[in-house]
Amino acid sequence: MPGKGTSQILANILNYGGITMLVSAKEMLDKAKAGHYAVGQFNINNLEWTKAVLLTAQELKSPVILGVSEGAGKYMTGFKTVAAMVKAMDEELGITVPVALHLDHGTYEGCYKCIKAGFTSIMFDGSHYPFEENLAKSTELVNVAHQLGLSIECEVGSIGGEEDGVVGMGECADPNECKTIADLGVD
């Protein structure tokens, strides 16, 4: 949504039909830190995997973060479908443990699609942009996410490996750039 101010973006999102929240990953992780326990984040790719993760989390009485890559979102016909499926399964399965729905390594556009769909956490991977562009997009997304009570991660530099066809060579990130991104208030 390039070129639009934050207030216009928020108005468009809220006019979209509202956002039904699950739980913010930040809220969940803050409680885990205070309680000295870990929270698992599992990327989901289909209904069966999602059901298995939710039922296991419920059985173990453990909060859980359900991660969705852009590729998995496309495979499951879109982020609105994923969010609707998770919310319906949460209700139909009687899940009572906290559940966060997280976009994992999302594009700028993917982050907005997930916000509109009702995700409670986004990870913007702007590491492939020049730093100033990454900073501008990260700043905008942090402001929008926090105004909506969502948690947000932003990436600078890269981690070695491949996901959804994106290859990170594992270069070390510039510590000053990391601090600048962290100072935005990322969660």
Regions found by a protein language model. Name each.
Residues A25-K31, N46-A72, T77-T96, G106-D187:
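Alpha/beta enzyme core
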Residues A38-G40, S62-V64, V99:
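A generic secondary-structure signal marking the coil-to-beta-strand transition
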Residues V39-N43, L101-H102, M123:
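Short catalytic-loop micro-motif centered on adjacent basic/acidic residues
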